[in-house]
Amino acid sequence: MILAATLYGFKSCSTVKSARKWLDDHGVEYSFFDYRVDRLDPKAVDDWFKRAGWEAVFNRNSTTFKELPEAEKEGIDAKKARAMILAETNLIKRPVLDTGKALLFGFKADAYAAATGK
């Protein structure tokens, strides 16, 4: 059973809203980290890269990424992805659920159930 988890994202994101509703409906204790309100600690990004790989964190499907000049989209590696994410948190797949044991990107009810034991 999860005592506390952290959900990262934007309050206005529909996927984040779905994740928050699921967590609330299933009685999962969590804190919410809003990228627009709080500055993301680079250590969190480093931890996510270490635990999940930068490709799992970096959102190539985001509007922000799609609107980048082609030259900026080329040659992305962990170092470049980290710098881009720290400059623009819209490049993080969201929401991010960190339970301490599980680290999930995006929202899928079955994955949340498995990660939280709910």
Question: What residue ranges belong to the model's regions?
Answer:
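Local sequence-structure signature of Cys/Sec-based thiol-disulfide redox active-site neighborhoods
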Residues: 2-26, 30-35
